[in-house]
């Protein structure tokens, strides 16, 4: 009797499961057919492009920055400048854009909303409300005091304020050199870039470069917990919150102290203080809200500094691999400033605008950014439409576009000999010139990075004050994992907010005899 009573239920269950499977198959077939005739890697009705992407990820070395697999796929299957990755139902399907005119259309002509793949990526370091505010079209316009701190003029004016931090960096490099030991340079570079941002915005130093710094480990511990892995974030959620709360308390105290110092008139008014005054005067925020907002702003500067530090590590890696470029850059430093280190520091203090004449050094930085691509930008799309630009029509069959900076920077028709480190292509008057909208490491349009001038200046200043005094020689373990040579070989990029040389870029630091 029991068996008979279960019969109808079993039949209903089987019919339901069969119906759901049939609906899933119908939906899958309908979805896969959207990509028929479109440029994609090997595509099948069962997996779409999931198999291709998974194979690339599994073939990558440990810690590899998986967004760069997109460029591997483009090369391997000879994809055009706009192609599609059908990743449904595991991941959102993506329209990969490596075409400048299409990228311009999406970001400047008809700007689309930025896609937030993981709203919790920087949580709880940044609140969801603050991230949403940052993504608004008028965010930069509503923060003129903060943006004023990111201009070339402000950076030049504040150069002398950076001297204590720069001397601390030199002292640390000397200590590492004298120790004769390998050292992962990533952490030191992160500290330097954060210091620059802190000095520019706060008017004072975080003192991160001192070996006894109390704040440096607090920041590093918070940053180490950032990442895409949801399992790790869940398992470590309590530890992540503890570290973030600790950093938050320190930054709240720092911002409050900066505001109080500005109110007292004890020192020149910093951009953070001016932003606070502006927000109170406009009525947009009360005192507590303004402090919280400015603390979140400092956290954004810290996160952006990590990405910039990754570019710094690759500058040293490429200059080591291309000694002729290193020699030419050092000669420019001698010519624009002085072969004498002491005179260089004096000129830097008296005439900081000379930094603007370091054209080849800036070209080294830009060529580095072209080669590593930084990452890319995700944009939301409306499906079942067409994107038309300059006579070309691109079907929109997925919800997300990925503007892939790396793929754009590695196109031979845009950048001749694209895998070679050739800073001369970025010199004024270079022939051929850089094609319009093809070099966009900080993106363009309303959502472009407001700190790009500060990032470029901080990297040029770093190379000026270290490259003639020290040789940083990458030292990877024998038999270390390697990626494709065009991605740095054993110095392949790993993910840490942005691309960094893997393993923290272990180096031997040598003090140059003729420095």
UniProtKB/Swiss-Prot annotation:
Heme binds at residue 449. It comes from the Eukaryota. One of its GO terms (biological process) is mycotoxin biosynthetic process. The chain crosses the membrane at residues 6-26, 50-70, 82-102, 300-320. GO terms for molecular function: heme binding; iron ion binding; monooxygenase activity; oxidoreductase activity, acting on paired donors, with incorporation or reduction of molecular oxygen. Its EC number is 1.-.-.-. Its main location: membrane. Keywords: Heme, Iron, Membrane, Metal-binding, Monooxygenase, Oxidoreductase, Transmembrane, Transmembrane helix. The keyword Kinase does not apply. Gene3D superfamilies: Cytochrome P450. It is found in: Membrane. It is an enzyme of class 1 (oxidoreductase). It is a multi-pass membrane protein. Its cofactor is heme. Pathway: Secondary metabolite biosynthesis. Belongs to the cytochrome P450 family. This is Cytochrome P450 monooxygenase ptmJ. The gene is ptmJ.
